[in-house]
Design a protein with these regions (language model features):
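Compositionally biased terminal segments of proteins
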Residues: 1-197
């Protein structure tokens, strides 16, 4: 493994992605690492990625990760939980990676919209702007709302508003209201209009 100290969760993620690739599991990096790709810099001690895998295949992936030397913990959500399962990887330096599976409302087409960014000489897949913003609005915590607004402000081009509206609808009425509020307060002119219909 590449990690040599704490604060290197991104390197732990790089190692884990090798296992994902060999198991033919698609992924999209989210969370603070994705925020940095979308123009928001903030400290993080972990790394997060969504996996395109069902929860039963997740157990086989966990065995592969264990065989490769990763320490894992698999937690399953109940019916009221917006996340079906989380597979957490840790190393001896307390670096951690959360692999998320089955987020309620998440569009599986997001895996085909990922953007590739090089890290440590490897090409990694990050969630696209519209998916990032919709997920942050769905999470709904104050920092998530700040991240959604900041990502839109930092974007070099306006988002695909039609897609963003559709993604918000997938997450439910509260996410739609959050998007409407964000856009009504948005200081920059966004193409395609602001009204959700």
């Amino acid at each position: 493994m590449r990690t040599k100290a704490g604060g290197e969760s991104a390197l732990l993620l790089l190692d884990a992605i090798q296992i994902l690739r060999s198991a033919d599991v698609d992924y999209a990096i989210v969370g603070a690492l994705a925020a940095s790709v979308h123009g928001l810099i903030r400290a993080t001690s972990d790394a997060d990625a969504l996996l395109s895998i069902n929860t039963s295949a997740l157990m086989a992936l966990e065995r592969s990760l264990n065989a490769a030397g990763f320490k894992t913990e698999l937690r399953r959500g109940d019916v009221s939980d917006p996340i079906s399962a989380v597979l957490t990887l840790r190393d001896e330096f307390k670096n951690s990676v959360d692999f998320l599976v089955g987020i309620r409302g998440f569009d599986p087409k997001a895996f085909s919209r990922t953007i590739e960014v090089a890290l440590d000489g490897e090409s990694l897949k990050f969630v696209a702007l519209e998916d990032f913003v919709a997920m942050k609005l769905f999470a709904g915590r104050p920092q998530d709302l700040v991240d959604a607004k900041g990502a839109l402000e930092a974007a070099p081009e306006p988002p695909n508003m039609e897609l963003l509206k559709e993604l918000a609808k997938r997450y439910g009425a509260e996410t739609v209201r959050s998007l409407e509020s964000l856009l009504s307060n948005f200081s920059r002119d966004i193409d395609s209009g602001l009204e959700l219909g």
